Regions:
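Substrate-binding pocket helix/loop in short-chain dehydrogenase/reductase
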Residues: 42-44, 48-53, 147-150
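Active-site helix of classical SDR
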Residues: 67, 102, 110
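Catalytic Tyr-x(3-8)-Lys segment
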Residues: 144-164
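Residue(s) in the substrate-gating loop at a strand-loop-helix junction
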Residues: 86
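Short C-terminal tail/terminal secondary-structure segment
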Residues: 41, 91, 170, 182-196
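Rossmann-fold cofactor-recognition segment
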Residues: 1-10
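Short, small/polar-rich loop/turn modules that mediate ligand/substrate recognition or access, typified
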Residues: 118, 123, 181-183
Length: 196
C-alpha cells in the first residue's frame, strides 16, 4: 500500500501519486478511477458554477489526469482501466446535473481511450454501481426528496456490497480472461440499470 494523498484535481498532484505508485510497486497494471465529489440533490437551475466545477474537477478532470499519467505504464504492462460512472448520468436523475455531467464525461473519455489504446493492449471499461455506502446515506439525509426520486430498492432486493459485489467485478475486469472486453459500461445496480 502506498501512503499518498491521491487528490486528482491538478496535474502535479497526479504526477506525484503516479511516481510514488511506480516507485513503490514497480509499475502500474490497473487504474481504477472512482473518486467523485458533488453537490447532488441541487436542481439544475440552482446549481452554482462552483458546484458544477467541483463535480467536473473531482471526477472528469481527475480521471483524465490519471489516465494520461498512467498511460505509459499501462502500455508497458498491457494493463486495464476501470472508470466509475453512475446511473445518474445514464438515467438523468433529478438534482444531479453536475454529477451526471461528470460521470457521462467519464463514459465518453473511456470510450475514446478504448478506441485509441486498444492497439497498446489496454482495455478500458466503465462500471455504474449502486451500493449502500456512507455517502449514499448522507445523500438520503441531506436531500430526502432527491433521494426518494432517484434511489429505489433494486429488483435483487438489496443494495450491492461494495467489496464483494462491486470490487470483485473490478478484479475480474482486470484479469486476462476479460481482456477482450473494452469500451463497455457495466451497470451493477441489481437489475435497476436495465437498458435496451
Amino acid at each position: 500500500q502506498a501512503d499518498v494523498c491521491a487528490g486528482g484535481n491538478n496535474v502535479a498532484t497526479v504526477a506525484n501519486v503516479v511516481k510514488q505508485a511506480v516507485d513503490t510497486f514497480g509499475g502500474i497494471q490497473v487504474l481504477i478511477n472512482n473518486a467523485q465529489a458533488s453537490a447532488s440533490g441541487v436542481p439544475l437551475t440552482e446549481h452554482t458554477t462552483e458546484q458544477f466545477d467541483l463535480a467536473l474537477y473531482s471526477g472528469l478532470y481527475a480521471a483524465f489526469y490519471y489516465m494520461k499519467a498512467c498511460y505509459p505504464y499501462l502500455k508497458e504492462s498491457h494493463g486495464s482501466v476501470i472508470n466509475f460512472a453512475s446511473g445518474a448520468g445514464l438515467f438523468g436523475n433529478y438534482g444531479q446535473c453536475a454529477y451526471a455531467a461528470a460521470k457521462e464525461g467519464i463514459r465518453g473519455l473511456s470510450r475514446v481511450a478504448a478506441t485509441e489504446w486498444g492497439k497498446d493492449g489496454i482495455n478500458v471499461n466503465v462500471i455504474c454501481p449502486l451500493a449502500w455506502t456512507a455517502k449514499l446515506e448522507q445523500f438520503q439525509q441531506a436531500y430526502p426528496d432527491a433521494f426518494k426520486a432517484n434511489v429505489k430498492m433494486p429488483p435483487m432486493g438489496h443494495y450491492a456490497n461494495p467489496e464483494t459485489e462491486i470490487g470483485r467485478v473490478c478484479v475480474q475486469l482486470a484479469m486476462p480472461d476479460f481482456k477482450y472486453l473494452s469500451g463497455e459500461t457495466l451497470t451493477l445496480e441489481g437489475g435497476m440499470g436495465l437498458r435496451p
